[in-house]
Every structure is written in structure tokens, then in C-alpha cells.
A protein has these predicted regions:
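Membrane-protein biogenesis/insertion across secretory and organellar systems
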Residues: 64, 77-92, 97-98, 103-104, ...
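GHKL-type ATPase core
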Residues: 1-87, 162
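Helical mechanochemical/support elements of P-loop NTPase systems and associated helical scaffolds
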Residues: 2, 40, 57-61, 103, ...
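A glycine-rich phosphate-binding loop feature that marks nucleotide/adenosyl-phosphate handling sites
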Residues: 23-24, 81-84, 127-132, 198-203
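Extended, Lys/Arg-enriched charged tracts that mediate electrostatic binding to polyanionic substrates
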Residues: 104-146
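GHKL/Bergerat-fold ATPase module
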Residues: 73, 86-98, 134-210
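Short alpha-helical segments and helix-capping/turn motifs at coil-helix boundaries
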Residues: 28-29, 60-62, 119-126, 168
């Protein structure tokens, strides 16, 4: 945790009363009301620990937003020291669109920008599965074999997303190890965001998807 305290203030549309949720992560939480006039919506304030002040660096914040939340539907704006806002994420996820609406050029650009490739993929596989478990996968087979393809310790290169939020790029078991030359993403709405990486790794949902 980077914050020693979190304060969430929320005001419902059509009302003037705000509710405040506070927690230090150690002694539960406290909810109180506030009659102070506030704008409709929710604000979240993090009171950073002294050893986490580097998270106030704008470049670091933008990098973190780009890594973990680049593809969520809501734009994330970061204000600089001059109070000027700049959108830090693309707020788009190519894989959520129907494959019929995506051009080969768009697939190639995504492949290059996401996986650092220099040429177009040899083959792409784009599927959406709906049912008791919902997930989308966008997989690429590169034209050029990775230089470390035959290294036993090479990890698979399929990144896991939950509701468009990046979780990890080295979750074991998503695809067999002999397919470690395959690169791509797996996005599911059937896993919870508030679980640890270890629980995701051992999730029966992930095993069924695999």
C-alpha cells in the first residue's frame, strides 16, 4: 500500500449531502455525512506514506496509468503543476470491437505497439466467448521466432486483463508452455479485480478458460 489513509467523498445526483468514507487500512473504516455543498460525483484522496512520495511524480503517474488502465472506457486526466489536464490513457481497447470492423493495419499497429514487434504478424486469432464465463482473446503468431524461443525459462507472452485493466503478462497456465512463441491478450469479466495475483493464478475460472 502506498497510502497511510484513504478518504472517499461522494455526492448523489439530486442531493446536496455528501458521504465520507475513511480508512487507514488497519482499524476498519468510518462513514460520516457532510452537509457541506459539493459537486455531484466522487472524489478519492490518498494520503501517501513518506516513503511513497515518488508517486507524486507526473511521469511515473502517467507510466502507471498507461500500463494498467490504458484500455478502460473512462478517460483518465492528470493535471500538472499549472493545473492543466492531459489525458494519460487511450480509453480504447481494440479487442473489444468486432473483428469485422478492425482492419489488418489496425491489428498490425496494435501488435507492434503492444509487443515491440517490427513486422506484421504471421497469423492472428481474435475470439469472443460468452456464457457462464465471458472472455475475449486476441493472439498473434509472429513471423520471426523469438531469440529465446528454446530457453526453458522463457515465459508465455499472453497478458491477462480483467475488465480491460492490466493484471500481468506472465500468468502461468493461460496457454501451454510449448506455445510460448504466441503473443497476445486475454480479457475477462469473470474474474474479480480485487483479488491477489496468486488467487488469479490458481483461479478455477482461469483454468476453465485455458
Amino acid at each position: 500500500m502506498v497510502a497511510e489513509k484513504v478518504v472517499v467523498t461522494s455526492t448523489k445526483a439530486g442531493t446536496s449531502e455528501a458521504f465520507i468514507w475513511e480508512s487507514d487500512g488497519q482499524n476498519g473504516f468510518n462513514i460520516s455525512g457532510s452537509e457541506q455543498s459539493r459537486n455531484v460525483g466522487t472524489s478519492i484522496k490518498l494520503f501517501l506514506r513518506k516513503d511513497a512520495k515518488d508517486y507524486l511524480d507526473l511521469a511515473k503517474l502517467k507510466t502507471l496509468v498507461k500500463k494498467y488502465s490504458d484500455h478502460i472506457t473512462v478517460p483518465i486526466n492528470i493535471k500538472d503543476n499549472k493545473n492543466e489536464a492531459e489525458q494519460a490513457n487511450s480509453a480504447e481497447a481494440l479487442w473489444t470491437r468486432p473483428s469485422s470492423s478492425i482492419t489488418n493495419e489496425e491489428y498490425t499497429e496494435f501488435f507492434k505497439s503492444t509487443f515491440g514487434a517490427f513486422d506484421e504478424p504471421y497469423l492472428k486469432i481474435h475470439n469472443k466467448t460468452e456464457g457462464s464465463i465471458d472472455f475475449t482473446n486476441l493472439l498473434f503468431i509472429p513471423k520471426t521466432a523469438p531469440f529465446d524461443l528454446f530457453e526453458p525459462e522463457r515465459k508465455t507472452r499472453v497478458s491477462l486483463y480483467i475488465n480491460r485493466v492490466f493484471i500481468s503478462k506472465d500468468i502461468d497456465g493461460i496457454i501451454p508452455t510449448w506455445l510460448r512463441f504466441v503473443q497476445g491478450i486475454l480479457d475477462t469479466t469473470s474474474l474479480d479485480l480485487n483479488v491477489s495475483r496468486e488467487l488469479v493464478q490458481n483461479s478455477p475460472v482461469l483454468r476453465k478458460i485455458s
